[in-house]
């Protein structure tokens, strides 16, 4: 292990500090975006939309078509097995 007097230690220290600072900035941006999303959902709720359903729609839209169809088929199978379909 290198002692604290080698030139590489300073470089590693600077790189580590840079990485940590970048992560901290991104975490701040992530928190700001999460707050913005929360405000949009609050606006939607104020306009009479069901936020739970909106979240489900957003989650479904992220899926590709095949994945969505597979999950819908499994859900239909389970509901049918329970006599709910």
Swiss-Prot record:
Disulfide bonds: none annotated. Pfam families: GapR_DNA-bd. It comes from the Bacteria. InterPro entries: GapR-like, GapR-like_DNA-bd. GO terms for molecular function: DNA binding. Signal peptide: none annotated. Transmembrane segments: none annotated. Belongs to the UPF0335 family. HAMAP family: UPF0335 (MF_00797). This is UPF0335 protein Plav_2034. It comes from Parvibaculum lavamentivorans (strain DS-1 / DSM 13023 / NCIMB 13966). The lineage of its organism: Bacteria, Pseudomonadati, Pseudomonadota, Alphaproteobacteria, Hyphomicrobiales.
């Amino acid at each position: 292990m290198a002692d604290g007097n080698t030139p590489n230690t300073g470089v590693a220290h600077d790189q580590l500090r840079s990485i940590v600072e970048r992560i901290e900035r991104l975490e701040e941006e992530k928190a700001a975006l999460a707050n913005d999303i929360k405000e949009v959902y609050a606006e939607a709720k104020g306009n009479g939309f069901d936020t739970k359903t909106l979240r489900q729609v957003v989650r479904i839209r992220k899926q590709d078509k095949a994945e969505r169809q597979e999950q819908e088929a499994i859900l239909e199978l389970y509901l049918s097995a329970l006599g709910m379909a």
